[in-house]
Amino acid sequence: MKLNEIPAVPGNQQSRNRVGRGPGSGNGKTAGRGHKGQKARSGGFHKSGFEGGQMPLQRRLPKRGFKNFTRKEYTIVQVEDLEKFFDAGSEVNAEALNDLGLLGKKQKSGIKLLANGDITKAITVYVDKASAAAVAKMEAAGGKVVLAVVADPEGDA
Protein backbone atom coordinates (compact mmCIF):
# COMPACT_ATOMS: atom_id res chain seq x y z
CA MET A 1 0.00 0.00 0.00
CA LYS A 2 1.31 3.45 -0.94
CA LEU A 3 0.66 6.78 0.79
CA ASN A 4 -1.63 7.93 -2.01
CA GLU A 5 -3.71 4.74 -1.69
CA ILE A 6 -4.60 5.20 1.99
CA PRO A 7 -8.34 5.92 2.19
CA ALA A 8 -9.59 8.95 4.13
CA VAL A 9 -11.28 8.37 7.47
CA PRO A 10 -15.05 8.81 7.03
CA GLY A 11 -16.20 12.24 8.21
CA ASN A 12 -12.64 13.54 8.30
CA GLN A 13 -12.68 15.58 5.11
CA GLN A 14 -14.62 18.81 5.42
CA SER A 15 -15.73 20.56 2.26
CA ARG A 16 -14.58 24.12 1.57
CA ASN A 17 -16.81 26.84 3.03
CA ARG A 18 -18.32 28.78 0.10
CA VAL A 19 -19.15 32.27 1.36
CA GLY A 20 -21.68 34.72 -0.04
CA ARG A 21 -24.08 32.02 -1.24
CA GLY A 22 -27.33 32.95 0.49
CA PRO A 23 -28.58 33.32 4.06
CA GLY A 24 -29.09 29.56 4.55
CA SER A 25 -25.35 28.94 4.31
CA GLY A 26 -24.61 30.99 7.43
CA ASN A 27 -22.08 33.02 5.47
CA GLY A 28 -24.31 34.85 3.00
CA LYS A 29 -24.74 38.60 2.43
CA THR A 30 -21.53 40.04 3.97
CA ALA A 31 -19.60 36.75 3.56
CA GLY A 32 -17.89 37.08 6.96
CA ARG A 33 -16.45 40.53 6.16
CA GLY A 34 -18.67 42.55 8.49
CA HIS A 35 -20.39 45.77 7.38
CA LYS A 36 -18.77 48.34 5.10
CA GLY A 37 -15.30 49.80 5.51
CA GLN A 38 -12.10 49.24 3.57
CA LYS A 39 -11.75 45.62 4.68
CA ALA A 40 -15.22 44.81 3.37
CA ARG A 41 -14.51 46.12 -0.14
CA SER A 42 -13.03 44.25 -3.04
CA GLY A 43 -9.61 45.23 -4.34
CA GLY A 44 -7.57 44.16 -1.36
CA PHE A 45 -6.46 45.86 1.82
CA HIS A 46 -3.63 48.37 2.37
CA LYS A 47 -0.15 47.35 1.26
CA SER A 48 2.15 45.72 3.80
CA GLY A 49 4.15 48.27 5.76
CA PHE A 50 1.47 50.96 5.36
CA GLU A 51 0.96 52.83 8.64
CA GLY A 52 -2.10 54.93 7.91
CA GLY A 53 -0.17 57.79 6.34
CA GLN A 54 2.48 57.93 9.04
CA MET A 55 5.99 57.63 7.58
CA PRO A 56 6.60 53.84 7.51
CA LEU A 57 9.37 52.29 9.60
CA GLN A 58 11.18 51.11 6.49
CA ARG A 59 11.48 54.76 5.30
CA ARG A 60 12.25 56.23 8.73
CA LEU A 61 15.39 54.14 9.15
CA PRO A 62 18.56 55.12 7.27
CA LYS A 63 20.06 53.12 4.43
CA ARG A 64 23.09 51.12 5.47
CA GLY A 65 25.76 49.10 3.71
CA PHE A 66 25.71 47.42 0.35
CA LYS A 67 25.75 43.96 -1.20
CA ASN A 68 29.12 43.01 -2.62
CA PHE A 69 28.36 41.13 -5.84
CA THR A 70 31.98 40.09 -6.34
CA ARG A 71 32.19 38.44 -2.89
CA LYS A 72 33.49 34.90 -2.96
CA GLU A 73 31.79 32.34 -0.74
CA TYR A 74 33.70 29.18 0.12
CA THR A 75 32.48 25.74 1.13
CA ILE A 76 34.02 24.90 4.50
CA VAL A 77 35.78 21.57 5.07
CA GLN A 78 37.20 20.82 8.51
CA VAL A 79 40.41 18.90 9.28
CA GLU A 80 38.38 16.44 11.39
CA ASP A 81 36.33 15.54 8.27
CA LEU A 82 39.50 14.47 6.48
CA GLU A 83 40.50 12.36 9.51
CA LYS A 84 37.09 10.70 9.58
CA PHE A 85 36.54 9.97 5.87
CA PHE A 86 39.97 9.43 4.28
CA ASP A 87 42.82 6.93 4.73
CA ALA A 88 46.47 7.83 5.28
CA GLY A 89 48.34 8.59 2.06
CA SER A 90 45.22 9.44 0.10
CA GLU A 91 44.90 12.50 -2.13
CA VAL A 92 41.80 14.58 -1.51
CA ASN A 93 40.36 16.91 -4.14
CA ALA A 94 37.00 18.54 -4.84
CA GLU A 95 35.70 15.44 -6.62
CA ALA A 96 36.51 13.15 -3.67
CA LEU A 97 34.88 15.56 -1.21
CA ASN A 98 31.79 15.87 -3.41
CA ASP A 99 31.43 12.08 -3.69
CA LEU A 100 31.20 11.91 0.12
CA GLY A 101 28.63 14.73 0.21
CA LEU A 102 30.90 17.10 2.14
CA LEU A 103 30.46 20.00 -0.29
CA GLY A 104 26.67 20.26 -0.12
CA LYS A 105 24.30 20.97 -3.01
CA LYS A 106 25.01 24.67 -3.56
CA GLN A 107 27.89 25.43 -5.92
CA LYS A 108 30.22 27.99 -4.32
CA SER A 109 33.43 29.82 -5.31
CA GLY A 110 35.73 27.15 -3.93
CA ILE A 111 36.75 25.06 -0.92
CA LYS A 112 38.38 26.35 2.27
CA LEU A 113 40.07 24.07 4.80
CA LEU A 114 39.68 25.04 8.45
CA ALA A 115 41.41 23.63 11.55
CA ASN A 116 38.49 22.31 13.60
CA GLY A 117 39.39 18.95 15.15
CA ASP A 118 42.59 16.91 15.03
CA ILE A 119 44.30 14.88 12.32
CA THR A 120 46.80 12.03 12.63
CA LYS A 121 46.88 10.76 9.02
CA ALA A 122 49.24 12.02 6.31
CA ILE A 123 46.84 13.25 3.63
CA THR A 124 47.42 15.49 0.61
CA VAL A 125 44.59 18.00 0.14
CA TYR A 126 43.90 20.17 -2.91
CA VAL A 127 41.82 23.21 -1.90
CA ASP A 128 41.36 26.84 -2.93
CA LYS A 129 42.06 28.33 0.51
CA ALA A 130 43.21 27.12 3.92
CA SER A 131 43.69 28.72 7.32
CA ALA A 132 47.22 28.90 8.71
CA ALA A 133 46.20 26.68 11.64
CA ALA A 134 44.79 24.04 9.26
CA VAL A 135 48.00 24.00 7.20
CA ALA A 136 50.06 23.66 10.41
CA LYS A 137 47.94 20.71 11.62
CA MET A 138 48.15 18.97 8.24
CA GLU A 139 51.94 19.37 8.05
CA ALA A 140 52.37 18.24 11.67
CA ALA A 141 50.56 15.01 10.76
CA GLY A 142 52.87 14.53 7.75
CA GLY A 143 50.31 15.67 5.21
CA LYS A 144 50.33 18.47 2.68
CA VAL A 145 47.95 21.27 1.64
CA VAL A 146 48.14 22.28 -2.03
CA LEU A 147 46.44 25.59 -2.77
CA ALA A 148 44.93 26.21 -6.20
CA VAL A 149 46.63 29.05 -8.04
CA VAL A 150 43.97 31.46 -9.27
CA ALA A 151 44.97 33.71 -12.18
CA ASP A 152 44.63 37.43 -11.38
CA PRO A 153 42.11 38.90 -13.88
CA GLU A 154 43.76 42.35 -13.59
CA GLY A 155 47.32 41.05 -13.59
CA ASP A 156 50.07 41.94 -16.03
CA ALA A 157 49.55 40.44 -19.46
From Swiss-Prot:
Q: Which GO terms describe its biological process?
A: translation
Q: Name one GO molecular function term.
A: structural constituent of ribosome
Q: Where is the composition biased (Gly residues)?
A: 21-31
Q: Which UniProt keywords apply?
A: Ribonucleoprotein, Ribosomal protein, RNA-binding, rRNA-binding
Record Pfam families? Ribosomal_L27A (PF00828)
| Stretches for region Disordered | 1-64
Cellular component, GO annotation? cytosolic large ribosomal subunit
* InterPro entries per the UniProt record, alphabetical: Ribosomal_uL15, Ribosomal_uL15/eL18, Ribosomal_uL15/eL18_sf, Ribosomal_uL15_bac-type, Ribosomal_uL15_CS
Signal peptide positions are: none
The family assignment reads:
Belongs to the universal ribosomal protein uL15 family.
> What is the annotated role of this protein in its UniProt record?
Binds to the 23S rRNA.
What is annotated about its quaternary structure and interactions? Part of the 50S ribosomal subunit.
Please identify the protein, giving its name as recorded: Large ribosomal subunit protein uL15
What is the species listed in this Swiss-Prot or TrEMBL entry? Magnetococcus marinus (strain ATCC BAA-1437 / JCM 17883 / MC-1)
State which gene encodes it.
rplO
